[in-house]
């Protein structure tokens, strides 16, 4: 068991192209978003495990002795045990959560407890730890915040228990794990995601683990080997929506108008494939014209998504406001509100970006200037992170 303080971060994600079409067997491109979740793990000797989630105002403390008495025999299934309903009911009792706990805050506690017991049970005694998780990602906005959380928890616990290597053992300021360790972190993070979401696709945790960009189709994932650095505006309309209802709406429209809807889905697939091709070219030899192609693809995809029925007045407003400043946007994720992305090509006048941000904020939206294709899960020294993050984590 390591005795030092560990500081880990993992990125969120956005869907660049292919949302909704992916449900019907088409390609989706998911990219790591450089808004990150940070976790600091401090070993303790007070016989307690504490989890502090300041973004949602939760602090929970458990007695190690009580957790030690738990029959963790139920975790003995194979290498990475999948959580069963029976196990989750037992853990809810220990966590002091109501049986019908479905809120993300409660499920975050449950996912932590599950990963802590499952990963640390190989230690002679369960370790005393103080863990704080703070995120730049807004929760419930379709940006992979729960996956970034699960990836951070899995990476920190596996490193602390010496199940994976410590990337900073040679005193660097930032590091990542070797491929085998990343696979292990990803497997455990997926189980954390299962506690929170039931039956996730695995895309969010994979993007958060490896970073960069992933192509996903019918359960198969592959990494886009090279990715140019792309700057974006990410805008949260803050309009709540139900992903389930939006997916069901597309399905019923497909049944009602198969001759119209099937070609739309095929076109969206072609947009994803063209974007993948252009990104590959840009990574090898970037020319300004390629950004114009990316902008056109975003416009076309946005119109297709409106035709599928997953648009929203707030997203139309976002696209109109950015278009007035010569920028190109599309929804990302489920649609019906939620978030949109706007491409910022190199050499864009600063004043134009600021004016667009101001106009979006004036609509009541939240707006971030960030990048996509970000690094995956990383270990940091305290000096390698920015002051606001350090302060939020109490470092």
From Swiss-Prot:
Superkingdom: Eukaryota
Phenotypic consequence of residue 20 to L/Y: Approximately 5-fold decrease in Vmax for (R,S)-mevalonate. Approximately 3-fold increase in KM for (R,S)-mevalonate
Entries under Pfam families matching the protein: GHMP_kinases_C, GHMP_kinases_N
Active site, renumbered: 146 (proton donor), 204 (proton acceptor)
Keywords: ATP-binding, Cholesterol biosynthesis, Cholesterol metabolism, Cytoplasm, Kinase, Lipid biosynthesis, Lipid metabolism, Magnesium, Metal-binding, Nucleotide-binding, Peroxisome, Steroid biosynthesis, Steroid metabolism, Sterol biosynthesis, Sterol metabolism, Transferase
Keyword presence, ATP-binding: yes
Molecular function terms, GO-annotated: ATP binding; identical protein binding; magnesium ion binding; mevalonate kinase activity; mRNA binding; sequence-specific mRNA binding
This protein's pathway: Isoprenoid biosynthesis; isopentenyl diphosphate biosynthesis via mevalonate pathway; isopentenyl diphosphate from (R)-mevalonate: step 1/3
Similarity comment: family membership: Belongs to the GHMP kinase family. Mevalonate kinase subfamily.
Identification of the protein by name: Mevalonate kinase
Protein species of origin: Rattus norvegicus
